[in-house]
């Protein structure tokens, strides 16, 4: 089965024709924190570009920061005094936290760093800079010249939606007052380069379209941008792709005003966190950022989450127990890719998903420390990172001979597992080793079984987890002790709970003398 990104890439080539270079675009308004839902737009453009590159084409991936949009409302996490900046470009609103040159830069810079950590190369462009240096001047003038046609297109869709037509004094652009920097209404155009405006403060004047103070309205700005950069593909959320929305009007405006065809698009669905209700909003502050995911996920897994889901399918990221399954799934796909494990089903699609979720694929399988087991080991106070690596090698989870890349990856996973246990793990997964044996009633046959296990461990200089597991089952079976009674007693003895991690692996990870003493109720 063909991966969805390859399917889209093939469709772009068919519909846009053979080119030496294709342009893919994504874009976001930095009105608040750029969250994992926003990232889906950039990643969808990126992965389709990746597929085009793999077919031998040059690709330019533009990510447009719409930082020349108005500051529309004061978010909850911003001081109410910021209402005085409403109507100004977000790129000119001061940073409330005082660490960046502007409100917009505060959010853009963080997201750009997060994207870089994923190894994704993208060309970030800033609408404020493009407008201010006059790069769009010719296209803005064309929009003024085609005002009547644009109104006709927009009114056609407004009528279908049973909305009133645009007023006769509507213009396809707005002005930022050079004096107050607030949005001003246009009241006249001289037919050339000058526009007359009136700002909310009552100030009137003329500005030159080439001065950078005139900005196209969204439904005109978007198709103008497609034409200016010759965009071949840009994904969009379903609000932009609904019937009569900005994509529909944009398709007609780009053709009527700029004489070009609209790029191909693809609708992407919502991204949320399992268990959280409602839609994330960067301006409301109820968001999960890429940097939040980096606290518990390797970069490859973040990319994998988005690569394996078709864009029209909703993603619910499970940061609870489902995260352990995600690591298991990713590790399995990675092993299949490197031929270490056989696969059932469509092997090629699995391999392609792995390829597309990695900008730079290693030349061999880097050691995979099982995250599920790491979540146990990081809770053992006697084990530091080196101790954990020793347990992993002794129990055969990773090779005994480790290279630098292997050790780096294992150490990263150890840190991620610690973070997961602290922040997201349910109580059923958490435990602590009891410093002293608890005072619990233990049946005589269970005591005998405990002593037999203690003697067996004492007699061995080394042993495998499987050997210990067999002993644990045998000593209970020959005494007629039920598995439930036997295992719950041992868990209570070590962690004070009736359930816990896989017992043999757990006991084998503890200090041998400590296990023997505890089984004898000595300490």
Swiss-Prot record:
Pfam families named among the record's database cross-references: Anticodon_2, tRNA-synt_1f
At the top level, the lineage of the source is: Archaea
Per the entry, the cofactor note is: Binds 2 Zn(2+) ions per subunit.
The record ties this protein, via PROSITE patterns, to: AA_TRNA_LIGASE_I
Q: What is its EC number?
A: 6.1.1.6
In terms of CDD domains, this protein maps to: LysRS_core_class_I (cd00674)
- Reaction(s) catalysed (UniProt annotation): tRNA(Lys) + L-lysine + ATP = L-lysyl-tRNA(Lys) + AMP + diphosphate
Span of the annotated motif 'HIGH' region: 30-38
GO cellular component entries: cytoplasm
Q: Name one GO molecular function term.
A: tRNA binding
**Disulphide bond pairs:** none
Q: Which residues bind Zn(2+) 1?
A: 95, 99-100, 106
- Enumerate the NCBIfam families for this protein: lysS_arch
Q: Which family does it belong to?
A: Belongs to the class-I aminoacyl-tRNA synthetase family.
What name does the UniProt record give this protein?
Answer: Lysine--tRNA ligase
What is the organism of origin for this protein?
Pyrococcus abyssi (strain GE5 / Orsay)
Q: Which gene name belongs to this protein?
A: lysS
């Amino acid at each position: 089965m063909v991966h969805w990104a390859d399917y889209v890439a093939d469709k772009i080539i068919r519909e846009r024709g053979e080119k030496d270079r294709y342009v893919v675009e994504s874009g976001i308004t930095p009105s608040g924190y750029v969250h994992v839902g926003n990232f889906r737009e950039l990643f969808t453009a990126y992965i389709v570009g990746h597929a085009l590159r793999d077919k031998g084409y040059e690709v330019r991936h533009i990510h447009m920061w719409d930082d020349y949009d108005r500051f529309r409302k004061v978010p909850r996490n911003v001081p109410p005094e910021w209402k005085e900046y409403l109507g100004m470009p977000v790129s000119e609103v001061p940073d409330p936290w005082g660490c960046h040159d502007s409100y917009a830069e505060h959010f853009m810079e963080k997201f750009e760093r997060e994207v870089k950590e994923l190894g994704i190369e993208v060309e970030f462009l800033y609408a404020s800079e493009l407008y201010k240096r006059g790069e769009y001047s010719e296209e803005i003038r064309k929009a003024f010249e085609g005002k009547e046609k644009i109104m006709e297109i927009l009114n056609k869709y407004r009528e279908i939606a049973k909305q009133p037509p645009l007023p006769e004094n509507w213009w396809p652009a707005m002005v930022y007052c050079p004096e107050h920097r607030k949005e001003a209404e246009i009241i006249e155009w001289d037919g050339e380069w000058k526009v007359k405006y009136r700002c909310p403060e009552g100030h009137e004047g003329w500005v030159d379209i080439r001065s950078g103070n005139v900005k196209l309205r969204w439904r005109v700005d978007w198709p103008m941008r497609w034409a200016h950069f010759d965009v071949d593909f840009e994904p969009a959320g379903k609000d932009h792709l609904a019937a009569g929305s900005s994509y529909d009007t944009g398709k007609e405006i780009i053709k009527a005003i700029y004489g070009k065809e609209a790029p191909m698009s693809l609708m992407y669905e919502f991204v949320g966190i399992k268990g959280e209700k409602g839609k994330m909003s960067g301006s409301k502050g109820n968001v999960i950022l890429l940097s939040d995911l980096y606290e518990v996920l390797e970069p490859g897994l973040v990319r994998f989450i988005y690569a394996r889901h078709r864009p029209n399918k909703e993603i619910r990221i499970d940061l609870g127990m489902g995260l352990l399954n995600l690591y298991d799934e990713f590790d399995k796909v990675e092993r299949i890719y490197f031929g270490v494990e056989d696969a059932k089903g469509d092997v090629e699609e699995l391999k392609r998903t792995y390829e597309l979720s990695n900008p730079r694929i290693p030349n061999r399988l880097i050691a995979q420390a099982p995250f599920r087991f790491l979540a146990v080991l990081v809770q053992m106070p006697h084990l530091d990172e080196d101790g954990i690596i020793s347990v992993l090698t002794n129990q055969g989870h990773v090779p005994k001979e480790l290279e630098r890349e292997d050790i780096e990856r294992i150490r990263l996973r150890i840190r991620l597992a610690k973070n997961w246990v602290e922040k997201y793990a349910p109580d059923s997964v958490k435990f602590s080793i009891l410093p002293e044996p608890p005072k619990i009633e233990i049946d005589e046959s269970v005591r005998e079984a405990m002593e037999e296990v203690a003697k067996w461990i004492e007699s061995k200089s080394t042993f495998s987890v499987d050997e210990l597991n067999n002993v644990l089952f045998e000593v209970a079976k020959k005494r007629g002790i039920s598995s439930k009674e036997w295992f719950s007693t041992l868990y209570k003895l070590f962690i004070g709970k009736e359930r816990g991690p896989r017992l043999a692996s757990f006991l084998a990870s503890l200090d041998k003398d400590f296990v023997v003493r505890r089984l004898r109720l000595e300490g």
